[in-house]
């Protein structure tokens, strides 16, 4: 049994970070590959939501999704939030798996406690369980940004999913940041305008 872990929203200027873990055996993973599973970035939103539903309802699949808000990212830092989320998944899902595979090149120092962790660069293209985790994390992120788009349409979150596209950066420059922006990220990019009041009034 393999536990695959991946994230969505790491490099976004707005919204939460989602880290997902999916545990299943290779036989079950093969079923998802036959359904068209691949790296979530190469799937249409419709296909991602379809696969998300199949993953969540499959009797032989264990899954965990951890959310870290923009506020938590600003308070603790992105690296700390990633580590805490992965740790939470391992604490919940470790008993289900004899192998743990994380997308990327860092185990966040957790390999001391969990020696069966393996980090795999582009793991979402190589390991089905990581691809399944990628699908879950991305579906959760997509859904969140669509919901936030209903509150703040000018930022184009339904299309850019919180990433720093030209339209998104121009909207921040013009309107200021919302309470859902990561201020630590937007300040770093020198695009944060202190016009918070204008957009915050809509939440009152």
UniProtKB/Swiss-Prot annotation:
It holds the Pfam family RNase_HII. GO terms for molecular function: manganese ion binding; RNA binding; RNA-DNA hybrid ribonuclease activity. Its EC number is 3.1.26.4. Keywords: Cytoplasm, Endonuclease, Hydrolase, Manganese, Metal-binding, Nuclease. The gene is rnhB. Manganese or magnesium. Binds 1 divalent metal ion per monomer in the absence of substrate. May bind a second metal ion after substrate binding. It comes from Helicobacter pylori (strain G27). PANTHER family: RIBONUCLEASE H2 SUBUNIT A, RIBONUCLEASE HII. This is Ribonuclease HII. Belongs to the RNase HII family.
